[in-house]
Amino acid sequence: ERAKSEGADLVVFAEQALSGTPALDLLCKTTFIELCEEALDEIASHCGRIAAVVGVPVLTECGTVSAAAVIQHGEVARCISKRFITARREMGFLVQGSGCETITICGERVAVIVGDDLSRTSNFDKSVDLILSINARRFGKGMMTYRYNTMHDLAYVESKRIMLINQVGGSTDIVYDGTSAVVG
C-alpha cells in the first residue's frame, strides 16, 4: 500500500523474503510451500498496477527451488529460479533451477537473478537494461565492500544498471547484512 501511495512502479523483496531464511527442513514440507504460494497470491492481489519481485520457495518436479516470483497486473506472471546452490545451509533443502531469465518490467528489459548467480555474468542476456539480483547473503567481514566493488565493476564493464536487494536481519545463527544498492 505504501508503494502505491508513493507512486512506485516496482517493489522488490529479497531472496526467500516470503518464507524467511534459512527455512531449512520447512523447504521439504509441501504444506509450508503451499502456504507460501497462498501468501504470494494474496500479495499479488494487492499489487494492482505495481510490478513486484518477491523471493519465495517454489515446489517443482525436481524439488524445491529458491525463486523470484514476478508479479505483474495483479498476477504471478512467472517464477525465475536460482541456478547455483552454493551455501551449505541450502544443500539438501533446495535444488538447482534454470537460473537467470530476461523479462520486461515497466518497459525495461530486466535480467532477474536469484542468489549468487550475479557472480556468473556470462549467464544473462547482454541486451538487458537492468540486472536485478535478489539475495540472502549473510554478513561477513569485508563482504559488503566486496559486493559493492563487484557491482561497480560489473556495471562499468557491462555498461548496465544493477540493482542488488539483500536480506536484512537475523535468523538462527545467521545475520544478514542488508547489502542493497543500485549502481549504474
Model region roles, listed by residue range:
Residues E1-G184:
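Enzyme catalytic cores with a strong preference for nitrogen-chemistry domains
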